[in-house]
Swiss-Prot record:
Keywords: Mitochondrion. This is Electron transfer flavoprotein regulatory factor 1 homolog. It holds the Pfam family Complex1_LYR. InterPro entries: Complex1_LYR_dom (IPR008011), Complex1_LYR_ETFRF1_LYRM5 (IPR045296), ETFRF1 (IPR052000). It comes from the Eukaryota. It is found in: Mitochondrion. Disruption phenotype: Lethality during first instar larval development due to reduced lipid reserves and energy output, characterized by decreased ATP production and increased reactive oxygen species (ROS) levels. Metabolic defects trigger defective food-seeking behavior and lethality. Was named osi after the Argentinian street language for the football term 'offside'.
Length: 85
């Protein structure tokens, strides 16, 4: 159970870190609050299978946010360096 706990804490910290650059008005604060609320909703979960499923869902969210950042950076670079013919 302590291994799952450390994985949950690690995922929480990673998602909070990713939330620093979340786009939009009050994006970082809103994203971090939503992550905090989601983790607090499941804080009393004891079933290891359910915890593993929630961890998988959290990892998926992290990958989606990372993809969003990559797309945002790509669009920014393309906009700066595109030639209008």
């Amino acid at each position: 159970m302590s291994q799952l706990r450390s994985k949950v804490i690690s995922l929480y910290k990673h998602l909070q870190y990713l939330g620093r650059e979340y786009p939009g008005l009050n994006g970082p604060q809103k994203f971090r609050k939503q992550i905090h609320d989601a983790f607090m909703n499941h804080k009393d979960e004891q079933d290891p299978k359910k915890i593993v499923a929630l961890l998988a869902q959290g990892r998926y969210l992290a990958k989606e946010v990372e993809a969003l950042y990559s797309l945002k950076k790509y669009r920014s670079v393309k906009q700066r360096y595109s030639y209008n013919d």
